[in-house]
UniProtKB/Swiss-Prot annotation:
Its main location: cytoplasm. GO terms for cellular component: 6-phosphofructokinase complex. GO terms for biological process: canonical glycolysis; fructose 1,6-bisphosphate metabolic process; fructose 6-phosphate metabolic process. The gene is pfkA. Its EC number is 2.7.1.11. It comes from the Bacteria. Substrate binds at T134, I135, D136, R171, M178, G179, R180, E231, R253, H259, I260, Q261, R262. The active site is at D136 (proton acceptor). This is ATP-dependent 6-phosphofructokinase. The lineage of its organism: Bacteria, Thermotogati, Deinococcota, Deinococci, Deinococcales. It comes from Deinococcus radiodurans (strain ATCC 13939 / DSM 20539 / JCM 16871 / CCUG 27074 / LMG 4051 / NBRC 15346 / NCIMB 9279 / VKM B-1422 / R1).
Amino acid sequence: MAYPNPAGIKRVAVLTSGGDAPGMNAAIRAVVRTGAQQGIEVVGVRRGFSGLHRGEVQLLGPRDVANTIQRGGTILLTARSHTWRSPEGRAKGAAVLREWGVDGLVVIGGDGSFHGGYFLQEEHGIPVIGVPGTIDNDLYGTDHTIGYFTAVETALEAVDKLRDTGASHERIFVIEVMGRHAGHIALDVAVAGGAEEVFIPEDKKPIGDVVNIVKDSIAKGKRGSIIIVAEGYDGGAEAVAQAIHAGTGLETRVSILGHIQRGGTPVSSDRILASRLGEAAVYALMDGKKGVMVGRIGGGIAYTPLHETWEKRKDVSRDLYRCAKMLSI
């Protein structure tokens, strides 16, 4: 079905930048296939902004993205670029886009990637649309980010297995999940995994509180405890485990899940979200929009200025936090 194209878009570039997230390939696929359906050529930039200023660009067609929707990672590869932080680096990238006749750029990534796209547009006038791709779910302007659902499922699977062995040995496990600045993953995993306690960056409660929580769990007859800690909480899982051992003398184990949360086959929710947002990004350029992130709020597509995605804070659900406390008896 033809979509109006008042902006006269003929060629679009797409790149992935920063940390990878499950579902990025589904977003790339959606951009390419939506473009093809609307008579718009799509070029892919390899290795993000790092590859852009080096001219790592190639045409992409529907067959190039076939059999990719189920794959983790990103077929375009990703990298962090120090060169892009300089005006000279961005000028070189802009020249590459002009050389390829690009009318607009779709950036799939997090706030760092959006910074790069924002300054490219401000300095060189190339329309940029952001697509939220980060497992942390910390971008303002969308209910969820691409990769978040899969990261939660990956972490939860590990928590379930650690709970089995923890209960068998009557042992405490302190499990660290990703989330440098936000506790979305930690909070969801804590509720879904039945954790006794959760520590998130948004809540600066004293680390010593965990000692009383563990003692209370033992008094209630629990054979083991699961404590979830977001990596952004002061001191991380190691500090929490040390506090428990110092205050109780109990055997405590730390498990840092790390980068495993970024990998793996994306779950259906991430594939669907990525497909919708990739399509919406192309339509946004055709509508003449620029400097915005396409997100999903309440089931509909929302457009948020790129600078607001990092200037405004996306809070964790206080209702869910209350629920975690209520159920940890």
